[in-house]
Amino acid sequence: MAIKNLQNNNDLSELLVSVRRVTTVTKGGRRFSFSILVVVGDEKGRVGCGIGKHAEVAEARVKAVNAAKKSMIRVYLREGRTLHHDIKAKFCSGEIVLRTARAGTGIIAGGAIRSVFEVLGIKDVVAKSTRSNNPHNVICAVFKAFDSMLSPRQVASKRGKKISEIVGNR
């Protein structure tokens, strides 16, 4: 259930990943509100996710978009279309595997992972989500994977080698 909306400011695109009705039980009865998960990106390597809660859906969406804009991170892409290397990550019970792909492969991913790649600007990637299909856990696992991803420049400086030795014949 992803709904795409292109924002005018900074050309950010946002995808609504999930909308849930949640309940707080008080002594006076049940109080209903909405929890919304949104992914925001510029389709050029910057992406963020946010959660918003409010009694009204529209207000919850505004809160989620603002939270996503504040949490944006930069992901360095290979040739502007795929990841630099394969990655595994886990968040709570959500476990994911992200693999690089050749040009023309497309986005082979399901559920919430696909929405992250679409707003990030990745065109070729293979992703698998195991153990959990909870959108929040899966998206947090993707962001954890992005945090652990290293660019060829970072790998070369860690190993004390040249970038050409690391990249090879890609």
From Swiss-Prot:
One Pfam family this sequence matches: Ribosomal_S5
Gene3D superfamilies named among the record's database cross-references: 3.30.160.20, 3.30.230.10
Disulfide feature: none
Keywords: Ribonucleoprotein, Ribosomal protein, RNA-binding, rRNA-binding
PROSITE patterns noted in UniProt: RIBOSOMAL_S5, S5_DSRBD
Assigned GO CC terms: small ribosomal subunit
InterPro entries reported for this sequence: Ribosomal_Su5_D2-typ_SF (IPR020568), Ribosomal_uS5 (IPR000851), Ribosomal_uS5_bac-type (IPR005712), Ribosomal_uS5_C (IPR005324), Ribosomal_uS5_N (IPR013810), Ribosomal_uS5_N_CS (IPR018192), Ribsml_uS5_D2-typ_fold_subgr (IPR014721)
Superkingdom of source: Bacteria
Gene Ontology molecular function terms on file: rRNA binding; structural constituent of ribosome
Domain (S5 DRBM) ranges: 12-75
Biological process, per Gene Ontology: translation
HAMAP family membership: Ribosomal_uS5_B (MF_01307_B)
PANTHER family linked to this entry: MITOCHONDRIAL RIBOSOMAL PROTEIN S5
Subunit structure: Part of the 30S ribosomal subunit. Contacts proteins S4 and S8.
Similarity section: Belongs to the universal ribosomal protein uS5 family.
Function: With S4 and S12 plays an important role in translational accuracy. Located at the back of the 30S subunit body where it stabilizes the conformation of the head with respect to the body.
Domain notes: The N-terminal domain interacts with the head of the 30S subunit; the C-terminal domain interacts with the body and contacts protein S4. The interaction surface between S4 and S5 is involved in control of translational fidelity.
Name of the protein this chain belongs to: Small ribosomal subunit protein uS5
Taxonomic classification: Bacteria, Pseudomonadati, Pseudomonadota, Alphaproteobacteria, Rickettsiales
